[in-house]
């Protein structure tokens, strides 16, 4: 993937850039692997906003991705196309299996049209192949890693990310996450070889608010810029600091929201960025 920069012909074009989509080989998706994706606008079943800054955007259809691949062990597949997926940052690859079935997978780096991929304990160590962690050499970069055997890939599914297999001891493998966290995972869990492609996606400059609206992202308005009826930080004469510790529109303290004491915390060897100096 490369990034194409625009000339500053308008204020919205100034500094903006776009992916060149050179790796895309087909523009129309496989119809049998599509599912409807109705818009929620960030609302729940009662019509209340539960996730802010969502709404609008271009109409999409969901591409059904195979995150397990366990039922295709030993069945080789040919990469028919590399396609664009509006629902994720990574590209997806359409596989044609030898038994005639078609499936989508997340496309790793260096996977090309015409390549052969396979899954199972005996698969080769090359991009796109899927194996249990116990069969992958130490030091290999992997993606689409399961947290529980048979549960489907949960880790490293975004563009440009990869996990390093640091070692194995007993029933667990030690992994280094993209965040720097080191955690243990059952060696029966499966993973795909290589890092995910489209790494330059994070370097795209969207240029104008309208492009974010096309993506279904609405503006983020500060609470101190609102009226008192809209936010606890709103109101006041002139510019104010809000007058209290940061809270959300419902008055609950803002900040870290992750629940402590999760059962899987015992498998974390080192928290993310534990060695980074603060200052």
From Swiss-Prot:
SMART domains: Ribosomal_L2, Ribosomal_L2_C
Annotated Pfam families: Ribosomal_L2 (PF00181), Ribosomal_L2_C (PF03947)
Family: Belongs to the universal ribosomal protein uL2 family.
Protein name from the UniProt record: Large ribosomal subunit protein uL2
Gene Ontology, cellular component aspect: large ribosomal subunit
Keyword Ribosomal protein: yes
GO biological process entries: cytoplasmic translation
Biased composition (Basic residues): 40-58, 269-279
Origin: domain of life: Bacteria
HAMAP family in the record: Ribosomal_uL2_B
Keywords annotated in UniProt: Ribonucleoprotein, Ribosomal protein, RNA-binding, rRNA-binding
Primary role: One of the primary rRNA binding proteins. Required for association of the 30S and 50S subunits to form the 70S ribosome, for tRNA binding and peptide bond formation. It has been suggested to have peptidyltransferase activity; this is somewhat controversial. Makes several contacts with the 16S rRNA in the 70S ribosome.
GO molecular function, one term: structural constituent of ribosome
Region (Disordered): 33-58, 223-279
Quaternary data: Part of the 50S ribosomal subunit. Forms a bridge to the 30S subunit in the 70S ribosome.
């Amino acid at each position: 993937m490369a990034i194409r920069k625009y000339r500053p012909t308008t204020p919205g074009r100034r500094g903006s850039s776009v992916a060149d989509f050179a790796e895309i080989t087909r523009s129309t998706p496989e119809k049998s692997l599509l599912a409807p994706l109705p818009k929620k606008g960030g609302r729940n079943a009662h019509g209340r906003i539960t996730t802010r800054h969502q709404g609008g955007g271009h109409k999409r259809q969901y591409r059904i991705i195979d995150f397990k691949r366990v039922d295709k062990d030993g069945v080789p597949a040919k990469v028919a196309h590399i396609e664009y997926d509006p629902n994720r940052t990574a590209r997806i690859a359409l596989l044609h299996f030898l038994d005639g079935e078609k499936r989508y997978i997340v496309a790793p780096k260096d996977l090309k049209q015409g390549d052969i991929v396979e899954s199972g304990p005996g698969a080769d160590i090359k991009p796109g192949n899927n194996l249990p962690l116990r069969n992958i050499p130490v030091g290999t970069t992997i993606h689409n890693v399961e947290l529980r055997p048979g549960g489907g890939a949960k880790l490293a599914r975004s563009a440009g990310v990869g996990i390093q297999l640091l070692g194995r001891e007993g029933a667990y493998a030690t992994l280094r996450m993209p965040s720097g966290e080191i955690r243990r995972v059952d060696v029966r869990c499966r993973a795909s070889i290589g890092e995910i492609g489209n790494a330059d996606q994070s370097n795209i400059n969207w240029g104008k608010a309208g492009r974010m609206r096309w993506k279904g992202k609405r503006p983020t308005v500060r609470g101190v810029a609102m009226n008192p009826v809209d936010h606890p930080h709103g109101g006041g004469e002139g510019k104010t600091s809000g007058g209290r510790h940061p809270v959300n529109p419902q008055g609950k303290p803002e900040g870290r929201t992750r629940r402590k004491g999760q059962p899987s915390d015992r498998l974390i060897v080192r928290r993310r960025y534990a060695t980074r100096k603060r200052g």
